[in-house]
From Swiss-Prot:
It comes from Bos taurus. Expressed in circumvallate and fungiform papillae, olfactory epithelium and lung. Lower expression in liver, kidney and tongue epithelium bearing no taste papillae. Very low expression in the cerebral cortex of the brain. Its main location: other. Glycans are attached at residues 6, 19. This is Atypical chemokine receptor 4.
Amino acid sequence: MAVEYNQSTDYYYEENEMNDTHDYSQYEVICIKEEVRKFAKVFLPAFFTIAFIIGLAGNSTVVAIYAYYKKRRTKTDVYILNLAVADLFLLFTLPFWAVNAVHGWVLGKIMCKVTSALYTVNFVSGMQFLACISTDRYWAVTKAPSQSGVGKPCWVICFCVWVAAILLSIPQLVFYTVNHKARCVPIFPYHLGTSMKASIQILEICIGFIIPFLIMAVCYFITAKTLIKMPNIKKSQPLKVLFTVVIVFIVTQLPYNIVKFCQAIDIIYSLITDCDMSKRMDVAIQITESIALFHSCLNPVLYVFMGTSFKNYIMKVAKKYGSWRRQRQNVEEIPFESEDATEPTSTFSI
């Protein structure tokens, strides 16, 4: 997968560069894509900076609270924690791609491979953990709640998700390199046919979008039906959260995967022979994948901050921090009269 606007997942040959999405050596006329590169130099660094700041703040808060304050965790807590970790690692690759868009790849061949693989691992694992959360919410609402806490199966599922994502990143580790134009791009041996390239593209779409989406859609649909039938409970807030989660997933992920699928079809049948159309496809992949990765910034809001208990806990932490600041000021003013006033930490649930 990797960042396709900086390094296409179509696995083009050596003569391709950063934003080229087709090997135009097969055509009589060379397609010059200077406008696409200029757009990338402006759009990508600006968008990545915004995504990095917002995503780092939200996901770091989630990880810190789960790691240091909430010791007793449910299955959903474990999935959300893994999701936040995946989102953080994904966000940490963005500064490298921002520099790559402007100055080219300056960190060498090994870092090109590692950064590309990290992007794929955490993008794919994030989508899978979203599916895990929906499955757990389905079981929590429609079946009898488990009394055993997290349990071994939950950790096995997390392990399998990470392993699957790592396996999907193998093409990045093997084929990504720095070309003669200082771009971190995939360079495949010539004997690998278009069917192999398209197969990898389709596999990424299936694992990174179709499978998680189908799981989420089915689980949340059944969960919503069950909630509606339940008497004497407040239904508006849970249903609103379910609806928001599904809509945000569709809005952020569907456009990118549609463009990605069009690329895969073009790899097989070479449908795009017009230079202007190829440029529009390149810009489309830049914009849609940026929107797709922005989902990592929204996950803390959708899965954590919308929970009343979590918001209450944040308020308690803020009050405790304010009390600590006032105490520090009193210590500086009247050090011999200071006391260590503490407040017990309470747990919360999603």
